[in-house]
Structure formats: structure tokens, C-alpha cells
Amino acid sequence: MSQIQDLKDENVEMDIDPQEQNEKKPLLLDELTKFTILHPYNYDSHIKLIEELKRLDKKKELSEARKTFQSIFPLSEDLWVDYLLDECKNCRTLDDYVRIKTLFDLAVQDYLSIKIWCMYLEFTLNLMDTSSFEQEQSELNGVITLTDAHSLFERAYQTCKFHFSKSQCVWTLYLEFLQTFGDALFEGEEEQEIVFKNKIYDFHIDRLKLPHEQIEETFTSLSTFVTNNWSPSEYEDVMVKSNKVYETTLKRNAKIFNKELLLNSANHSLEAYMDLINDESRRSTAELQYITTLYERAIVLYPLIPELWLQYTAWLSKVDFSSSQASSVAERATRNCSWIGRIWSIKLTYMTLSGASTSAVCEEKDRCLNSNLLVNFDEVIDFFSGFLKACLYLSSNEDKPQEFLKHQIHKVEDYLRKNHKGSKDARMRIELSKIYLYSEISDFESVEKCWSDMFHDFQNQALYWISRYISTMKYNPELAAETLKKSLYKNVDQPQLLFQFYQSIMDLNNDCFTNTSHLYDVLNAQRISFKRQLDSFAEETKQTVENTEPLKVPQADDTAALSKKRKPGQEGDVFKKSKPIEQHRNREELTVLVTNLPSDISENELKIFFKDCGNIIRIFILEDNQKDVKVAQIEFSETSEVLAAKTRDLKSIRGHEISVQIHVDTNLYVTNFPPTYDELDITKLFSAYGNVVDVRFPSLRYNTNRRFCYVQMRKPDEAHNALQLHKKLLEEKYPIQVFISDPLRRTPRSGAVYEGRELYVTNIDFKVNEKDVETFFRDYGQVESVRIPKRFNQHKGFGYVVMTTNQDAENALSAAGKQLGNRVLNVVLSKPRESLEKTRVSSNDNRTLAKSFETTESNKMSTPKKSFEQIKSKSLGVTNVDGTVNEARLRSLFESYGKLYRVVLHPEHEGAVVEFLDIHDAGKASLALEGHEIGGRLLHITTVNEMMHNVPSSMNHSDYNTSATRPRRLGSRTFQGFNSNHSNINSKKDDLDDKEMQIDAPKSNDDFRKMFLK
């Protein structure tokens, strides 16, 4: 089957094998040529064709293919450079020069490319140097006049001079041109030498007036020029005047330089460009050409971003730019983003304003539609909406403007009926444009017909009724008021917006008595609307309950079975109280955002305002971008309370009309950041993308290895903006992961352990390394990774092997019992670590100090055995440790006072054990870190004994075994891991005498310090 038959879709990617045999190449070239003819708007096919022609060195066909490509699509900077370099090599005749000059003119129109401008200027300088011409280039002698060259250099400089970082190379080429051809350029003028000297001086001064990165080089060049061309007596006066210009520009230059540094640090991201553009646009002394250059610089990097082109073309309409210049930008916008209807409509608008004829505008409209570039219905609507508005201006050129407008409306309706039958525009753009045109020609009967036709589809939209009122007020105020009154009782999407609009209209147009009578309608409609919302919520709740699997009711046989006498030990199974289901806070759906609040609003005032809505869990009051107002985030406990809070939308607080919206998509789930990061580090990281409201770390009580947090941003757009951090490398080893938090999208845990691909291998020979283990297990399948934990450069005798598939892992289980090195391996599948919640011990099974310091057998074999007193003397007990503080943060804090042996968290005691290698380091740390704040708490340094006795104030005792327990007798040795029967004590612990095994009575801080400082 031929390749061309597989390329039916316009958007298909043409993956063509470059290693195809030579005899098939002509066939491939023919198919590419045919395909580009059949599908001229397929970008990739043009690229493939050009690459193939270039490989085959078909220069003539290559030039034609590039010409066709450029006529349809704007070429990128790299494509233009490649194109122009090839063409410049073959500049031999006058026709070649005309063709290449035309290409350069087209290239500099597409994008503001300093590289292409420099190529253009160097090409011109080379042609003016006839001494380097070959014999066959004789036609090129004098092809460029001095005046034409001067005009070109001036155009290049004026176009590029506001490019802060790269415009200097254009200026330098221009200066070289003036210095080389200045004598001939100013020949014949009186006092030619003085004119030339002043021209070069003014050229430097003009450059110094503009901020640019190489401003010091420019000033140095000026100083050298003045030294060489002015007498010593004149030098000082000239340089004093020049220095004033230089010093004035330096102040502006420093500000822009700092902004350019931020741009570089952001890797020239689109967001950084837009921030810089918006910042410059707000300045009262804004330089319009500098802002234009910023837009052009952004477009070079992001030519296919529609929002960038839309903002650029819209900005041109607000500033003092000619319609022809704006029309040129719009033309380029359609070439880059030809699938965006709004951009096409803006182009037609600028064509109309620049004086284009009706036929020219209509031809451009038809060209857009016939090319099938607007495939999305929404884009077609945007296009026609703008076109109909432009028709109002075009009708002024017609003999019968009303008939022209109606004809264009009917053509649009016919097109939509034929190509998009059944599609509806929820934003009513075409309908509103039609109503606007009918109103302008005073055809109010057609206006009413439009509103009536829209009623069926849009009667539930508040925007429909508000727009209808505004439109009808122009020709029938009484009908408008009556229509708006009826809309109050409609079940619309934004009832509060409609109520507030109605009240505002009544306040503007009626006296106090009439206003009072209308108040009844508003209050009654609000009551009905609120009842609708509650009924809707109740129905949704009912459906949720019905879809939930019902609880199983015990049958008669089951009841009888329960009534029988049970065996001892079965009571717990039958009568154990069921643990209540833990209710998770769904902050994403239970928080509302309140904006436009008074700047001095208080939390108590907000509680009073929303008290009737429900139970408020917490309130955050934040600064807004506008300094005179604030915003607040209010979290409720139930969905119905959020709906009730929504009824406060558009209400007033001390003269401020507030907005209340459900606050979704503001919480971010963040993981895989450096273990030492705390709330301040996370806040600093995310503050670059918006205002951070809150950072919440999880409790480590049941899993000390958790490393994630939730970051709440002020607004949804700020949260989405922060997604740019996703996969950014922190500290050169941690690719952070950032997601919009969505509890409804929680997925089951995944990974090697959960997929049954990880093996737990024990009894590994201490002389064996990870490479040996990997080689050993390759006999059973493909090995993904091997990890053998180490301490002090010696592994512990166990490790983890991850296979590529679970089948390979099953095969590798047969390695159990086989010898590696001098030991026989034990191999089992790794199991997910159960949370401490499931393995929690009873409250009477108190952990002991000896148990806290118990080491594994592998540790005993790899490190010298230490006495219990030695371990205890170098260990600190740390209490009041917040449940969100992990081991890495504690280690980072304590290791600044000396080398650590280990850090062990004890979340059940809100504490930790920190063991140093040196007793003096432990003493220094105990004195220095007493009362140190971490995680919002002040640490208390004590003994390990006291820490292990610590009962957190926040502990819920009902979570533990609630059976009655006897107070422990002083001197008793019955504790976790040991029995009163001495024969059951592990023989390996015989070296610990009874005194060492006993938990000491709690010591005071003074006793503890004396132990270290004696």
C-alpha cells in the first residue's frame, strides 16, 4: 500500500524512514509532493518535503517548495536562517539578488529576529564591497545604491533598537556602515567633515538615550570618537553634555536590567514576559515601542500561543498605533494561529478600519471559511460574531445599508445551519451580534423576534434576562421593566446576580414608594430560589443514598446463632464496638472565596455575617491585588452550608458589594520535595506563583516516612500557575511533583511493592555488593533495581530487588535456599508496610528504654557492641515534637552540633530519640536546642526515659485499649518484649543486668545537665 493512502488526515504526522533504499526515494518524493498539493495546510508534510529535497540536493525544487511553504505558514527563525543561508550562497545574478532581497524582506516581517536582521545587513555590506566579487557576479556591481543601503540600515536600527539585550549588534553594524561610507554619503554638503562628525556623535547620543544592556560599551565608543575628533579644549565640554545623557539613562537602565535578569532566571517563560509587559504597561511614562518589542520578543519564542496574539492585537487598539500597523500584526497573527476565530475577526476589523473595501473584507472572510481552518464550532462563532460587528462599518459604503446588513446576517445563519446544524452557543454571541445590528438600524421588530427565538434555549440563564432588559430599554422601557420582573421567578443559573441587578435598576429609576412595592417581588423570589436550591440538594443527597449499598440486616438464623453460648475469647468479635468511620475534611468543595471585602474587615465580623449559613471551621483573611480591599476564604462543614453561603453573593458589607464563589482548584498536592523542607521553604517556593494561604503537612504518627503536603493558594488561577513547578529539580536530585488536589480522583497505590515485583532478600554475605546481587538475579528475569541498605560503608545483610514484571519476581522466588557468596539466601515477596494504626500496641504494653535502643543482628555484627549505659549517655530524648516533623528535619537540626548515630521518631509520644557519636556533642545540643522552635512548637530536651513516659496532651485514649489496667509496681520488669518468667528472656540479652533493664525514675533538667557537665 502506498504511503499516500495512509495520510488521509490533515493532522497526521508523516514518519518517513530516512534509511529507505535509494531506489525508493523518487517514489517517496513524488508522494510527498502529491500530499502537500492535496493537503496544503499540513505543516509536517511541507517540512518532510523540504528535508527530502535538501537531502537529494534538488536546489530548484527546494526553492519552490520553500516558497510555497512560506506563502502558507510563517517560518520559524531557524527555518528562515537555513533558507536564507542556502539562497545567499547562490547569489550570482541580478535576478538572484532581487529574489534574495525579497526573501529577507519577508523574513523580517514575520518575527523580530535580530539574527536575520544582522544577516540582511551583512549581505548588503558584502554586495557593496565589489572587490570580493567573482567574474560571474559582474551583474551585481552597483546593484545597491548608497541611499538604499542607508535606508535599510536605518530601518533595521529603528525596528530593533528597543531590544534591550541584542540590539547592540544591529547598532554596531550601522556604525560600521556610517564610518565606512560616511564620506560618500555626505559628499557635496557644506562643511562635509563637520556634518559627518556631528552625524556620528548624534548617532551615539541617540543610542545612549535608550536603555540597553551594552550601554557602557556605547559610552566608551563615544568617548573614543570624541577624543579622536575634538580638540582637548573642546573635549571636556562635549563629554560633560554627553555624560548627563548617560547618567539619566543609567537609572532607567538599572531598573530594566533587573527585570531582564528576572526574565533570564525564568528561562524566558511566557509568564515572565507577560508579567514584564503588564508591569511596563501600567507605568505612566511607558515607552510604547519598548512594550511592542517585548511582545515581539515573546512571539519569537511562543509564536503559536493564541492568547499572546490576542492580547497583543487588543493592546494595539488601546494605544496610539496606526490601523495599518495593527492590521499588519493581525495578518501575522492569523498566519501563526489560523485556527482561532477571534484572531480572524480582529483581522477583519482592522482591515475595515484601515479603509479596505467591502469586497476585500468579504473575500478575506470567504478565504478563511473555504480553507477549513476553523474546525471548532466555538471558533466559528467567535469569527462570525466579530465579522457581523464589522459589517456595521462596511454598510456605510453601501447604497442600501439595511439590506446589506440583513443579507450578511442571513448568510451567516445559512452557513451555521448547513455546517453546524444542532449546535448551540451557550454565550449567545451570534444572537447578541444580530440584536446589536438590528438595534442600530432601528429594526426593533426583528430584535423582539430574536429574543423570542432565544427564550427556549436561554431562559434559565441570568445573563439572557439582563441582556434582554438592557436591549429592550433602548426602545421600550416599560416592556423592559416588566420582562425583568418576570425573570425573578425563573429558575436561573445565577439568581443572586439577577436579584442584585433588579434591585440596582429599581434604585436608579424609582422613588421610595415604588421601590418598596418592588421589594416584595425581590424577597418573594429570593425565598423561592433558596427553596429550589435546598430541594435540589436534598434530591442529590437522596440519589447518593439510594446508590449506596445498603447495610446487611441480620436474619433470624444469624440472630439465633448470636444468642448461643460463645466460647471464651469470642466476646470481642461479637460485641466489639464498631469504630466510627473517619470523616475526612473536603476543603476543596467546602470552602468559599469572598472578594471585595473592606480593608479593615475582621474575622468576627465575617462570622456574624455568615452565622446563619452553618458551622464555620476556619477563616483566612488575605490581601487582594487591590490595596483597598481584601479577600477571605471561609471553610464550612457541609455542602448545604456552602450553598447557603452562596446566597450571600452580591450582598453588601459596609458599602462593599461582595462576591461569594465556591473555592475549588486552590489546593495543591505536593510531594517528592527535599526531606528537610518545612513550611517556610514550601511557602517561599510557591510564593513566586501567587499568594500562599496555608501549608499543611500530614501527621507522621502512623507512618514516619510520609513526605507530602498540601499547599492552598488564594485563587484557582494561582494554583494552576504553580503547576509549572511540576517535575522541577530541587537541590539537583528531587523532581518535585505538584498536582491539583482532588479527593475524588484518589487512585490505588502503585509501585513495585503493590505490583508484586519487589523481593525482600535476607542473609546476604557481607562481602557481596549490589552488582553481585543484580548479576545473580538476572538468571530469573530482567532486574530493574537493587537496593542494599548500608551504615558506615557496610551493608546490613538484607536488601530489596525489583524485577521488571511480577512474573520475573515469581520466578526469582526459586532463588530462596541458593548460595550467594558464603551464605544461603532467603527470598520472599515484599509486602506493603501496614500503618502503625493496625499494629498499635495496648497502652499497658509500655516500651522500654532498652527496647528503644535495640539493634538488629546485622548491626551487631557490623559495629562494636556498646553497653547500655554508653548508648544512654550519648542519647537525648526530645519531646513536644510536632507530628508533622520528619526525621530529616530533626537530623538537619541536631547534626550541626556533632555527628549523629541515628534519629528515631516516636510520634506516639510526640518525641524522638537522638543518639550522638560523642557525649560532648550531645551535651552541647541539649543546652543549645532547649526551647528551639520547629514546626510551630518549642522543643524540650530531656532524657530518653522521660520521653518514653511522655503522654501527648492531644492523645485520644479511646484509640487505645480501654480495658482497666493495674498501676505498674515499682521494680516490676514486666514490659513489652519481656515476661516475668526469666526463662523466656532472650539469651542474647543476658549481658544486660536487671538494673540496666529497669526504667529509671524521671529526672529533672538539672539532673540531666549534670550528667553531661560533670
From Swiss-Prot:
Entry GO terms, CC: nuclear speck; nucleus; U6 snRNP
Residue ranges annotated for the RRM domain, each copy included: 590-667, 666-743, 757-832, 874-946
HAT repeat windows: 57-89, 95-126, 148-180, 286-318, 442-474
Listed Basic and acidic residues bias regions: 1-11, 568-580, 987-1006
Gene3D superfamilies in the cross-refs: 3.30.70.330, Tetratricopeptide repeat domain
Database matches in CDD domains: RRM1_Crp79, RRM1_Prp24, RRM2_Prp24, RRM4_Prp24
Molecular function GO labels: RNA binding; snRNA binding
Polar residues composition bias: residue spans: 953-965, 973-986
Keyword RNA-binding: yes
GO biological process: mRNA splicing, via spliceosome; spliceosomal complex assembly; spliceosomal tri-snRNP complex assembly
Region (Disordered), start-end ranges: 1-21, 556-580, 953-1006
Sorted UniProt keywords: mRNA processing, mRNA splicing, Nucleus, Repeat, RNA-binding
Localization per Swiss-Prot or TrEMBL: Nucleus
PROSITE patterns listed in its UniProt record: RRM
Domain of life per record: Eukaryota
Any single Pfam family the record assigns to this protein: RRM_occluded
UniProt-listed PANTHER family: OS02G0815200 PROTEIN, RRM DOMAIN-CONTAINING PROTEIN
Described purpose of this protein according to its UniProt entry: Functions as a recycling factor of the spliceosome, a machinery that forms on each precursor-messenger RNA (pre-mRNA) and catalyzes the removal of introns. Chaperones the re-annealing of U4 and U6 snRNAs (small nuclear RNAs) released from previous rounds of splicing, an initial step in reforming the U4/U6-U5 tri-snRNP (small nuclear ribonucleoprotein) that can reassemble into another spliceosome complex; this step involves binding U6 and facilitating the unwinding of the U6 internal stem loop, followed by base-pairing of U6 to U4.
Protein name, per record: U4/U6 snRNA-associated-splicing factor prp24
